[in-house]
Amino acid sequence: MGIADFLLQNKGFKDLNQSDTDALSTVCAEETFKAGSTIFPEEGAGDKMYVIKSGSVKITKKVKETENTIAVINPGEFFGEMALLDGMPRSAAAKAGADTVVLSISRDNYTALRTKTPQTALKIVDILVKVLSNRLRQANKNLEVISFWIE
């Protein structure tokens, strides 16, 4: 399956039409990671976002020298999306949980897409805002549960 078709069938990109996925596919690169390999380290450069085609990715955060898995990302889902928006260092690490194939979108390529097809780029930002909002809501729920047990 080609990149544009994969994106078109991906529920995360359901708001994109064929023309949008065609444009987006031109700025995607396919990358492969072996199980256990680091995709990006915590505090590493925030220069790409990723969409999982196959495999899985563990998002980990180091707390007091202990690496904790905070999320497992599966095919069709994305991670590292804050890099497209702010370019800041990574807040967590990403490691392949299995042999994994991802599509990556670099910040530079996204900037080029914004210039070439601004409507598509705006739709992508809308998608990322929804994803980040959902993750923030979940983090708030998790904090509520933690604070209940601490009190």
Roles of regions detected by a PLM:
Residues 1-151:
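Cytosolic regulatory regions built on CNB/CRP/Popeye-like sensor folds
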